[in-house]
């Protein structure tokens, strides 16, 4: 019997059945297609043996003028800058209490009740105490004067922590621990942590119990939603924004351990935004742009307002006839989902379509043109610039932008969107794998609260592939940058906060 050479079509096709897809591939995992043939994807290794706390959903890499490489790392609990092999905690400070904190211990318990008027803390916040004295027994000064994680809040003035020694072992109070720590206790509070899961912005179940009147819409704060950071470099410095929360500035010249500070703390700060949905630096004329910023004189996010600073200034946001600060209220949709900088253009997705933002100079500074109605983003991080085009994922399909928007034919469309957890859609993110001519999107399947699947598109060969993640390949953020010799990603072990 003569031998027959079978040639299989490249790519995965799930639009039919396994039997109807004769001559093609129906399933795969951790496989890509190159020159029409399947191959195992390359391996990976740890970038550093140091670890960060929390789920990282934002990475940003850049190189300063002195050729030092930095990576900003935003998690739902902390904010770091990675230099070399070390994660430096630069989480901004929210509040400092001076000579106003007391402690109360209970015999036989490791729980300490901390009293601090209007502390503003939430569970898992970090607070560092100083100048406390012993409570009289096992809870000595060294136990108190260190950093703690808030276990739970009791009232607006009290919360609980679990006593520990300097090695992290639990300390149990005894009957002699009757003191209160003295009258000179100081406390430094980091910004409130965010959530590790997505919550709809308003409606039943959003916000805290009894925070508004019965039947009214209940907005949620940045500490009550999935923590997403956006980042960019402003020269050698790093700027960042919590989605729906604060905007911060890290001064590289002050050292890698220097905390990031609110924009409002910058010298000569003039009407700087204090809240936003996303931040970036324009590649033309070096304006800092805040999407979903609070308006001048307001203290709430305006979800369609785009504001920008004067050229090459982080502190001057007051529009005048002698500078280039300004702002525009978008008319399409109800909120900005995300923005992406491409060559000579910034794309802004609202929940109703796509707007192109371009630098035009005086007097308008930027132009805004609606280029598409309908297609949006499934999440703020689901648009990818690659191959001189922009690929993005919406709630029901994949799209391509190259001056206009077109829907991408997809041979795994039903496989992806019939089994995706839209309740956690903001965890979805996209990335570029330039060496393989691929765009990859990670997403949670229908029964998963965390990312457990991915889908890739090879734009050179026009083929799709699919796969799953596990403890060795769980990814929550991914970047490719000129300052790196390799893709850099973040992940976590199931059930872990590191």
Annotate each predicted stretch with a short phrase.
Residues 1-96, 191-218, 237, 249, ...:
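N-terminal beta-propeller domains
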Residues 2-8, 331-498:
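Beta-sheet-dominated scaffold domains
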Residues 70-92, 157-164, 245-262, 395, ...:
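Short, surface-exposed terminal/edge motifs of secreted or surface/virion proteins that either
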Residues 75, 84, 115-120, 161-170, ...:
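Secondary-structure transition/turn motif
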Residues 89-95, 258-267, 319-321, 366-371, ...:
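Beta-propeller fold detector
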Residues 90-227, 255-271:
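Small/polar beta-strand repeat architecture
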Residues 226, 230-247:
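Elongated alpha-helical scaffolds
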Residues 233-234, 243, 254-256, 261-287:
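Active-site-adjacent structural elements in enzyme catalytic domains
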């Amino acid at each position: 019997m003569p031998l027959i050479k079978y040639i299989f079509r490249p790519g995965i096709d799930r639009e039919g059945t396994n039997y109807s897809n004769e001559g093609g591939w129906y399933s795969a995992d951790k496989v890509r297609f190159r020159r029409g043939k399947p191959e195992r994807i390359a391996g990976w290794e740890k970038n550093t043996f140091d670890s960060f706390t929390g789920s990282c959903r934002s990475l940003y890499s850049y190189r300063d003028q002195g050729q030092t490489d930095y990576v900003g790392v935003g998690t739902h609990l902390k904010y770091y800058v990675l230099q070399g092999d070390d994660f430096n905690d630069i989480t901004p400070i929210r509040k400092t209490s001076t000579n106003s904190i007391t402690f109360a211990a209970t015999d036989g318990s490791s729980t300490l009740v901390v009293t601090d008027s209007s502390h503003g803390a939430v569970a898992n916040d970090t607070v560092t105490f100083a100048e406390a004295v012993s409570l009289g027994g096992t809870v000595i000064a060294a136990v108190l004067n260190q950093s703690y994680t808030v276990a739970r809040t009791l009232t607006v003035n009290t919360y609980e922590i679990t006593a520990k020694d300097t090695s992290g072992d639990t300390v149990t109070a005894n009957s002699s621990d009757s003191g209160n720590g003295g009258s000179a206790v100081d406390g430094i509070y980091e910004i409130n942590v965010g959530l590790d899961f997505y919550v709809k912005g308003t409606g039943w179940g959003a916000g805290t119990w009894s925070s508004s009147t019965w039947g009214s819409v209940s907005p949620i704060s940045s500490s009550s939603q999935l923590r997403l950071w956006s980042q960019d470099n402003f020269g050698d410095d790093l700027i960042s924004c919590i989605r729906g929360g604060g905007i911060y500035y890290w001064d590289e010249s002050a050292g890698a351990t220097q905390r990031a500070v609110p924009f409002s703390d910058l010298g000569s700060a003039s009407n700087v935004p204090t809240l936003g949905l996303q931040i970036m630096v324009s590649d033309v004329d070096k304006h800092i742009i805040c999407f979903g910023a609070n308006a001048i004189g307001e203290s709430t996010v305006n979800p369609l307002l785009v504001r920008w600073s004067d050229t090459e200034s982080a502190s001057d946001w007051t529009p005048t006839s002698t500078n280039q600060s300004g702002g525009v209220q978008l008319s399409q949709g109800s909120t900005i989902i995300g923005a992406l900088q491409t060559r000579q253009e910034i794309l802004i997705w609202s929940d109703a379509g796509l707007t192109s933002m371009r630098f035009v100079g005086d007097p308008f500074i930027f132009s805004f043109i609606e280029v598409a109605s309908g297609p949006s983003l499934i999440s703020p991080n689901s648009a990818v610039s690659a191959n001189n085009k922009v690929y993005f994922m919406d709630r029901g399909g994949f799209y391509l932008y190259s001056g206009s928007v077109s829907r991408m034919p997809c041979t795994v469309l039903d496989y992806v969107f019939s089994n995706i957890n839209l309740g956690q859609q903001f965890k979805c993110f996209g990335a570029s794998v330039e060496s393989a001519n691929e765009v990859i999107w990670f997403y949670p399947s229908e029964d998963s609260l965390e990312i457990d699947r991915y889908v890739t598109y090879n734009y050179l060969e026009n083929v799709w592939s699919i796969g799953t993640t596990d403890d060795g390949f769980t990814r929550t953020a991914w970047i490719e940058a000129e300052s790196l010799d390799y893709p850099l990603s973040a992940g976590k072990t199931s059930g872990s906060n590191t």
